[in-house]
Amino acid sequence: AKFITAFFRNPEVRDATMDLLKNRDGLMLGICNGFQALIKLGLVPYGDIRPITAYDPTLTFNTISRHQSRLVRTRIASNRSPWLAGTQVGDIYTVPISHGEGRFLCSEELVRKLADNGQIVTQYVDEHGVPGMDVDVNPNGSIWAVEGIMSPDGRVLGKMGHSERVADGLYKNVDGCYDMKPVSYTHLRAHETSQ
């Protein structure tokens, strides 16, 4: 993520990115390392590229101190983002993960603010849809079982789970709903036809 953040902090790239998001109805998605970059840039949770302090959220080493690669359940906690327009709050999806540094950390005050603002978009959950801290549920030990967050306007979304690693014919012998479609085709298509 360090290379990605260095690239985006270039003034021309930074200005073009902010123009895309603020003036041209653009969307941005970061998955796994991309999520790490979005956090280190400030795009999530703040919606702007800005300097980061020790008090800002971060993604750090999993609590079990090793890489995890498996399937987990995540629940939609907020669908205010155009990226999640095809989902309902409470929907549960099975998502592949593969990371060693996926634990979302921030202050209790900030995580409550994110929840109150509807910026926590997905959480790791058990088979009943309940967020938890057990490693079998929350593979990295993220505070409040956070798997993904978004910017205040929902245009920027970051998540750890690899929704893009799901395709027809995969995971045939594993129960779960895999059809999350994080990219809102409906939103993108509506935008395209309005031009």
Please name every model-derived segment.
Residues 35, 100-102, 163-165:
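Glycine-rich beta-alpha junction loops
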Residues 186-193:
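Conserved small/polar residues in nucleotide/adenosyl-binding loops
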Residues 146-174:
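A glycine-centered loop/beta-turn motif at secondary-structure junctions
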Residues 30-32, 96-98, 160:
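Short beta-strand segments
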